[in-house]
Amino acid sequence: MQNRWKDWVHVTKLDPDKSLPPAVIDEIATSGTDALMLSGTLNVTIENLGHLFKQVAQYGLPLVVEPAGPEAVLCEGIDLLFVPSVMNSNSVQWIVGKHQQWAQQSSIRWDKVIPEAYIVLNSSSSVGKVTGADCGLTPAEAAAYASVADHYFRFPIVYVEYSGMYGDPKMVRSIAEVVDRAILYYGGGISSADKAAEMGRWADTIVVGNAVYDLGPDVLRATVKAVQ
């Protein structure tokens, strides 16, 4: 599992603060997606994270927790922890501060941790607001963040996050052209096979989240087929 994640092309993001009936969970888990990421920005607790984990654990898919902060990290039974640092945040808290708190408060399973260099590009999103991200970047500015993340800090993942809004393919292309070693993730507004294929042209891995709740499993399956 430690390196198999590098081969994923489609990840489904599930929010612990949102609920889905068991039948829909079953359709998601059998859609062909490579992994399930348990992740949210607001109102994530150990309790609702644990509840979501119990819903999805039975399917045998790789399970990733992407914690929003040190107060809600689930490790037991989870394959990997994808831990974001928001490169374009105006606050050191979201780059390294919360990570320092986590290390001070907890005994961390570092063998499960995969660091992510987030570049947040939707100022209206919860993650954009909470982290104070500078979302008005030009393609050249965003690419520079990605280059620093890849070549200087050696992040294994560079994650372009539009969070609920479909992004600019030219922006993603500019970032893809400077990322050599890291795996490039794209998330935001993928609500059709065409959008999945368009972003999948530049990103190594696409992440589908809101469409699961807004449009249902059929759309999710279409996005899987578009990139696999």
Swiss-Prot record:
Lineage: superkingdom: Archaea
Broad EC category: transferase
Keywords noted in UniProt: Cytoplasm, Lipid biosynthesis, Lipid metabolism, Magnesium, Metal-binding, Phospholipid biosynthesis, Phospholipid metabolism, Transferase
Primary location: cytoplasm
Subcellular location: Cytoplasm
Function according to Swiss-Prot or TrEMBL: Prenyltransferase that catalyzes the transfer of the geranylgeranyl moiety of geranylgeranyl diphosphate (GGPP) to the C3 hydroxyl of sn-glycerol-1-phosphate (G1P). This reaction is the first ether-bond-formation step in the biosynthesis of archaeal membrane lipids.
Protein name: Geranylgeranylglyceryl phosphate synthase
